[in-house]
UniProtKB/Swiss-Prot annotation:
Protein's name in the database: Large ribosomal subunit protein bL9
Lineage: Bacteria, Bacillati, Bacillota, Clostridia, Eubacteriales
A GO CC annotation given for this chain: ribonucleoprotein complex
A single GO molecular function term of this UniProt record: structural constituent of ribosome
Role noted for this protein: Binds to the 23S rRNA.
Any single GO BP term: translation
Keyword Ribosomal protein recorded: yes
Family: Belongs to the bacterial ribosomal protein bL9 family.
PANTHER family: 50S RIBOSOMAL PROTEIN L9
Species whose genome carries this gene: Desulfitobacterium hafniense (strain Y51)
Length: 148
């Protein structure tokens, strides 16, 4: 019997895949637990339309990430913080502070976990910050850290 998996099943496969399994395994295990449905033509059509919608949604997310990346790469952000002698900061500038500065100065709401710093910013100056907006799209922008 052919079944379409509704969830990942260990030792069988991933959600959305079609498999040939024995009738007993399907009726006694997969169907009662809601892990699979029978692969009828209607269910296969539903699966195909869901996959097409997912692809369209992923492509749209990628396009949005690319437009945001183009916008971010032209920006630079200023952060004012307390510093000691020789340009060393008291503490460091974190992703959270950079994300807040982005929102305050340019109105871009970006999750702090998407910002990648090679190392914490602990001095005054200009630094490049990379933002991973999508698995295939990254943007780089400058952060100017100045004494307050």
């Amino acid at each position: 019997m052919k079944v379409i998996l509704k969830a990942d099943v260990k030792a069988l496969g991933k959600k959305g895949q079609v498999y040939e399994v024995s009738d007993g395994y399907a009726r006694n295990f997969l169907f009662p637990k809601g892990l699979a449905v029978e692969a009828t033509s209607g269910n296969l059509n539903d699966l195909a339309s869901k996959k097409a919608n997912e692809e369209k949604k992923k492509e749209q997310e990628k396009q949005e990430a690319q437009t945001l990346a183009a916008k971010l790469s032209s920006l630079s952000i200023e952060i004012h913080t307390k510093s000691g002698e020789g340009g060393r900061l008291f503490g460091s500038v974190t992703n959270k502070e950079i994300a807040e500065a982005l929102k305050a100065s340019h109105g871009i709401n970006l999750d702090r976990r998407k910002l990648e710093l090679k190392e914490p910013i602990k001095a005054l100056g200009t630094f490049n910050v990379q933002a991973k907006l999508h698995p295939e799209v990254t943007a780089q922008f400058q952060v100017h850290v100045k004494a307050s």
